[in-house]
Each structure stands twice: as structure tokens, then as C-alpha cells.
């Protein structure tokens, strides 16, 4: 009987098909009270001239997580931001070139740290505001089925992405299945606001912020306004009373009544996941 080493030496990798694997990175930020997403404009086929989520093929010497960190730095110029694996998109026909499986990640990037530019394979890069992501039965179905791709096929709401200059694109205008990926990411973030500290990942300075800044982030992700009093009471109950935010003193140099500044104390047990 041959040893494992002998078996591996004679193993024929051509016995099985080898799908390509990519990482797609949804780089979100909050600016001007809106949730914004970094997209790149493709300068190559397929989907030449279409806007797309930045990403790239997985290298043979890196893990998916390492590839995601690399691409966030290449596209947005940042490191050490909150990132998490979103979902694996594996529809057989999702890429017209060949069989490609995409591992999607979302990244929460403070706007003040964002330094984006068009990289390899892109003519342009821009921040788009994100609107039109619907809720309702489709969300319940995706959770029950544990299959966002199937649930999104039944989604009647359309995704609307708008540049500050006013140019808008819909989900149908995006490359590949990136509209589905974006919808899935927005819903993931909305669902996690109440039981994780995800919103704090968007703060420009977690050591010195106001509750108004934090509320604006929540509203941007949720896509609607929140009652100011209820929000403050919830944050004070869930965070200040638990010692996860602490007062730093009143804001200086502000017009009108100064706001209280807070500092976020990261709790590894809750953090972002």
C-alpha cells in the first residue's frame, strides 16, 4: 500500500474541475448623512463600462480573508477597519467568462479615512448613495432558507445608487450579480445594528463622538429617520449603563448648546460579529 506522500506525488489535479474564486469587497461609509458604497467603473470585458463592486481573483498563496484585506487597502487606502465575510455567491452562470465563485465581504470604513482611486481594471471609482433596498417577506424567506440568492430572485424592489453629482444607476445597470450582493450586504448591516456594535465602525473618531453622530449612522444604514428621544434612551440604556460608552465632557467650539462627547469602549464579546 502506498504512503500518503507517494499518493500526493502521483495525484492528478486534472481529475476535477477547478472553478475560479474571487473576493468582492463592499466598502461602505457614511457621508452627508447617507450610506455610501464605493464602486468602480470597469474598463475591460465582460461588462465593459459598467459599475461594479471592487474585487479580484484569489491568489494561490493567500486566504480569502487575506485577499479581502489586500483589496480593501488597494481600493480604499485603509487597514484595520471592520470587515466580515458576507456570503458566498456561486450561481453557475454568474460570470460569462468561466465558472467563478465569489466570496463577498463588507467593510465599514470611516469617511475621514477613505482614500479611494480607480485601480487595475477600472476607469473610475466613485461613492454612490444606496437607496431602494426593500425589506419584508423576502428577508424572512432568506433567513428561513439560508439562501439569499434564491430569496433575492423574488425581490420586486430595485436598488438605486446615486453619485453626488446626481447620476443614478439601478441594480440592472451593475455588472455581474452585484445588485444581489449589495442588497444582501445592506440587509446584513440593518439586521446587525441592534445586537452588535457595527455602527461604531463608521465613526471617524470612536474616542470622541456625539450621540447625534451615532444616530446619523444608524439612520443612514436603516434608510429612515429615528425618534431622537427613543434613540438616546436606547443608547444610554444599552451602552452607557453597561460602561461601553463613557462621557468625555462637553463639545467645545460648537454653536448653541454644546453636546456631550462620548468614548466607545470596545467589547470583544459583542464588537461587530
Give the residues covered by each predicted segment:
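Active-site segment of metal-dependent pyrophosphate-handling enzymes
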Residues: 19-21, 65-69, 73-170, 174, ...
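Conserved Nudix-box catalytic region and its N-terminal flanking loop in Nudix hydrolases
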Residues: 34-79, 88-90, 192-220
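Structured surface interface patches that mediate subunit assembly and partner/cofactor docking
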Residues: 202, 236-241, 254-257
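Charge-enriched amphipathic alpha-helical scaffolds
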Residues: 225-247
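Long, intrinsically disordered, low-complexity Ser/Thr/Pro-rich regulatory/activation regions
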Residues: 243-273
Amino acid at each position: 500500500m502506498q504512503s500518503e506522500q507517494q499518493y500526493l506525488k502521483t495525484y492528478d489535479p486534472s481529475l476535477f474541475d477547478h472553478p475560479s474564486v474571487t473576493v468582492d469587497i463592499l466598502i461602505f461609509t457614511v457621508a452627508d448623512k447617507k450610506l455610501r458604497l464605493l464602486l468602480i467603473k470597469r474598463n475591460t470585458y465582460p461588462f465593459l463600462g459598467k459599475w461594479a463592486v471592487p474585487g479580484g481573483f484569489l491568489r494561490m498563496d493567500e486566504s480569502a480573508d487575506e485577499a479581502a484585506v489586500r483589496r480593501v487597502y488597494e481600493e480604499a487606502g485603509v487597514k484595520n477597519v471592520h470587515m466580515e465575510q458576507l456570503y458566498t455567491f456561486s450561481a453557475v452562470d454568474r460570470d460569462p467568462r468561466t465558472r467563478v465563485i465569489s466570496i463577498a465581504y463588507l467593510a465599514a470604513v470611516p469617511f475621514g479615512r477613505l482614500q479611494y482611486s480607480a485601480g487595475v481594471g477600472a476607469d473610475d471609482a466613485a461613492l454612490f448613495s444606496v437607496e431602494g433596498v426593500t425589506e419584508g417577506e423576502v428577508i424572512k424567506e432568506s433567513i428561513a432558507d439560508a439562501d439569499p440568492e434564491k430569496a433575492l430572485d423574488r425581490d420586486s424592489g430595485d436598488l438605486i445608487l446615486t453619485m453626488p453629482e446626481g447620476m443614478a444607476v439601478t441594480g440592472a445597470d451593475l455588472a455581474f450579480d452585484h445588485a444581489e450582493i449589495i442588497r444582501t450586504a445592506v440587509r446584513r448591516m440593518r439586521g446587525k445594528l441592534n445586537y452588535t456594535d457595527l455602527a461604531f465602525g463608521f465613526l471617524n473618531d470612536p474616542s470622541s463622538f456625539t450621540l447625534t453622530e451615532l444616530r446619523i449612522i444608524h439612520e443612514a444604514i436603516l434608510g429612515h429617520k429615528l425618534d431622537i428621544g427613543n434613540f438616546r434612551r436606547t443608547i444610554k440604556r444599552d451602552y452607557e449603563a453597561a460602561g461601553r460608552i463613557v462621557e468625555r465632557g462637553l463639545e467645545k467650539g460648537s454653536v448653541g448648546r454644546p453636546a456631550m462627547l462620548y468614548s466607545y469602549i470596545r467589547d470583544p464579546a459583542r464588537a461587530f460579529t
